Amino acid sequence: MEKLLSVIIPVYKVEKYISKCIESVIDQTYKNLEIIIVDDGSPDNSGEICEKYARKDSRIQVIHQENQGLSGARNRGLDRATGDYITFVDSDDWIHPNMYEIMMKQFGDSQIEIVVCDYQEVLEGQEPAKVDICKCSKTIMTEKELDNGYLMFEKKTRFVVAWNKIYKRSFFDDIRYPVGKIHEDAFTTYKLLNKAKGVLYIDIPLYYYVIRETSIMGEGFSDKRLLILDALIEEMVFFEIKQKYKVLGLVFLDYRDYLIDYKKKIKSENEYSLDILKPYFSVLNKYLVKMKKMQIPLKKQIKSFIFAKFHIVIL
């Protein structure tokens, strides 16, 4: 019998998009689904639209709650979920009709505990490019390869976001998303990946990520962006405690590159003082002495040292 997959859909103020999202889930070729929709205090008709679908499909359950943000809505769904596996869909996105069938088949290997697929960005109002699901390639990462971390960082965004993955349910027994923070995936996904004996990556885009005109983050700098640095600091501490120094080194370089980018943006926009980055440069300096242990190449060590000490970027 097919394993039960719990699909968690947090919903807030998406009456224009939610029908397409829900229909893409209920039309999946993989049928053994528990669809948990969390209406996070939507002020529009989103909750009512969700209830309409629940009356038509017994696999759907709708939870209504006071607004707690994306993390709070996901956590409420996790508390309710009873499936063998967990996945998420953002309520303004949609998915390929074969997504769950293709991904759930990969769990036949006992070592595979998380399956990841590629995704495609779709501008609001447009349709995605067609994909040939027969021409996908797969990469299996064992625990040792995950500790090296290279593929995870080569395809960085794909391994940070929550919604292009299917996870073993037990991975969430002691993990929840941080309420009140944006970039919640950056605070959480690495902990889930660290639990896995094996991760399988499928290189075809089965998830359609909608780029809306009213996206949370613009291109400019905002102090909210510093939460990415906070998440990376937590991640560095996590991998240092685990003594996984290769992954730690990759997170360190990621942290450094974000700092470089934010410093440039602050200087060019003149809306914030560079003093806002002082605590983050202190963290960068703290890790300089560990670069050799993190197996960072010499050229990157030099670039990191010069930037940390003199705030100068060399190519």
Model-derived segments and spans:
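Donor-binding/catalytic cores of nucleotide-activated saccharide
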Residues: L70, S91-V199, T214-D223
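N-proximal low-complexity "stem/linker" segments adjacent to membrane-targeting elements
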Residues: M1-I26
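A short, glycine-/small-residue-rich helix N-cap motif at loop->alpha-helix starts
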Residues: E66-A73, L78-A81, K181-I182
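Membrane-interface aromatic/basic loop that binds lipid-linked glycans or pyrophosphate carriers
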Residues: I266-L315
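Acidic helix N-cap motif at the loop->helix transition within catalytic regions
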Residues: S19, L33, D44-K52, H64, ...
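Catalytic core of nucleotide-sugar-dependent glycosyltransferases
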Residues: L206-R212, E219-Y245, Y258-Y287
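A conserved acidic beta->alpha catalytic loop
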Residues: S24, K31, D39-E48, E66, ...
